[in-house]
Amino acid sequence: MTLQISIDELLRYSSEERDKWRQWLVTHPAAMESPVQPAGGFPTIGKLIDHIFIVERRHLQRLQGQPLSSATGLTGNNVPPLFDYGASVRRELEQYLRELGDEEADEVRQFNVRDRMWPMTPRKLLFHILLHELRHWAQVALAVRLAGFDPPGDHDLFYSHALQ
């Protein structure tokens, strides 16, 4: 038996999570400063969300053969502009997906990441973008709980309307 999830289903699930977190963080803006990795690259929830969105931008730029952005240009502590940036990148990703043909999606290409060439298909990189984001939303949920907040519920795919 073959069970599968489509990129469209995973994209819808990811978008549901973004919307849920955006709505919650607008009403709990102090949570943006909650610690994630105090001595690491993502010291706060806001900085981790900024990372989610810039990584999506950079991987999309890789797929399109464009120069890579170095940063979002945002502080990572103001919910509306940060999520607006993420929504803008997501619209571009959705447009890329609409234009991507099946053959092109499965053609192995070389992607330069961290000064190393990685052979992979655009299909793999697209799934990675979404799985990368979903893993980080789980980290956000844990950080929110550890900071004493009650996060928005029903994050599991089980509760999602993205697929039946």
Residue ranges and their predicted role:
Residues M1-L3:
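Short, contiguous pre-domain boundary segments
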Residues I5, S15-R18, E56, D84-L93:
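Solvent-exposed, well-ordered amphipathic alpha-helical segments
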Residues D8-L25, A30-T72, R114-Q164:
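Short, contiguous alpha-helical
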Residues G65-A105:
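Helix-adjacent hinge/juxtasegments
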Residues R91-F127:
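A mid-sequence interfacial segment
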